[in-house]
């Protein structure tokens, strides 16, 4: 099969590799649609200590497809089923799983290698995090389940409610999906970003109530507060960039009693500085949410299937496997939101 293999930072190759036969409980999926992702771009640029443990390695993790082969003992699926699979599944036995904190599982079974014609899905993911698609749902839309599951997890854990003012800095795919989910939950949403392609998507896809161009207004705190009820500050402020200075900036935008959600992960070892008086006496809730769980993976599929989230509007272009490196470069240059990768041309 054709597969994009990661060799080292900024060195990936589309080449022929063997299809891994399915072991007990596993399935081989013929990939019909895959998507580029910010994590993949970071991996392309500097590698990844978890996803890429040895090289060469498969690459990519957002996909949908058709079951091509079944391993021994697989139940609930058959060859020909149209499916979407997550890129992980919790063990259900470790300390965190016993506390129902499945996203923090110490033994997450991770899956990488979606930029390929076939992928072999581990047994635990087959059992816990692989879903059959509704007949009306396209492969292209279904491939968005994994990134949307992260956002739905974050939005529900944040407790976004109808009528609240929600502000988001950072409007890549995750920030845009956060804005759209917040709108579905009934919030009033203001977003801030720099990229003209993504600013347009904030209107066309997310349907944000107000959009700030940070090139024109680099310090959006005043605009965020003016957007809020009585100018007190946002009910919910969400950071989707992953820079310490933006963490500090978004903290300044929330009201007393509000919630700050730091969703964008900063570089390891980063430090931030907050006014502890404002945090303590303002009764401000500060939180972060990582990854997704089987529950939110299912919620993501439901949202996409319902048509409430028009994920296809986030696709910048459709490319073959041979153009994945080009896609990475386009992302680095800020010329795309997401690329749809079609392994079969």
Put a short name on every predicted segment.
Residues 91-169:
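NAD(P)H dinucleotide-binding glycine-rich loop of Rossmann-like/cofactor-binding domains
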Residues 175-176:
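N-terminal Rossmann-fold NAD(P) dinucleotide-binding loop
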Residues 168, 183-249:
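Adenosine-nucleotide cofactor-binding segment
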Residues 3, 184, 191, 225, ...:
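C-terminal hydrophobic helical "lid"/dimerization subdomain
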Residues 20-34, 48-95, 132-136:
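Glycine-rich beta-strand-centered segment in the early N-terminal region that forms part
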Residues 241-306, 342-345:
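Glycine-rich phosphate-binding loop and adjacent beta-alpha segment
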């Amino acid at each position: 099969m054709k597969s994009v293999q990661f060799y080292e930072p900024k060195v990936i190759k589309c080449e022929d590799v063997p299809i891994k036969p399915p072991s007990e409980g596993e399935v081989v999926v013929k990939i019909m649609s895959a998507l580029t992702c910010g994590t993949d771009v970071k991996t392309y640029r500097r590698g990844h200590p978890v996803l890429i443990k040895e090289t060469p390695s498969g690459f990519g993790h957002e996909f949908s497809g058709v079951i091509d082969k079944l391993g021994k003992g697989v139940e609930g699926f058959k060859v020909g089923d149209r499916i979407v699979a997550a890129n992980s599944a919790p063990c259900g036995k470790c300390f965190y799983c016993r506390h129902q904190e499945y996203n923090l599982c110490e033994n997450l079974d991770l899956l990488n290698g979606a930029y390929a014609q076939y992928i072999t899905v581990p047994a635990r993911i087959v059992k816990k995090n692989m879903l059959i698609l509704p007949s009306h749902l396209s492969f292209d839309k279904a491939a968005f389940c994994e990134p949307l599951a992260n956002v739905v997890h974050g939005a529900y854990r944040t407790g976004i409610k109808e009528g609240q003012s929600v502000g988001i800095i950072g409007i890549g795919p995750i920030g845009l999906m956060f804005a759209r989910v917040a709108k579905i939950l009934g919030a009033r949403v203001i977003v801030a970003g720099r990229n003209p392609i993504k600013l347009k998507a904030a209107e066309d896809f997310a349907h944000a109530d107000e959009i700030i161009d940070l090139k024109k207004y680099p310090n959006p705190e005043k605009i965020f507060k003016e957007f809020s009820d009585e100018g007190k500050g946002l009910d919910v402020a969400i950071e989707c960039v992953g820079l310490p200075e933006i963490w500090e900036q978004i903290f300044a935008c929330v009201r007393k009693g509000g919630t700050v959600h730091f969703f964008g992960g900063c570089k390891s070892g980063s430090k931030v500085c907050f006014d502890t008086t404002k945090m303590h006496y303002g009764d401000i809730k500060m939180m972060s949410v990582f990854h997704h769980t089987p529950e939110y993976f299912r919620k993501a599929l439901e949202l996409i299937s319902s048509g409430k989230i028009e994920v296809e509007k986030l696709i910048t272009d459709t490319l073959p496997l041979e153009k994945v490196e080009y896609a990475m470069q386009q992302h680095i240059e800020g010329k795309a939101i997401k690329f749809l990768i079609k392994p079969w041309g």
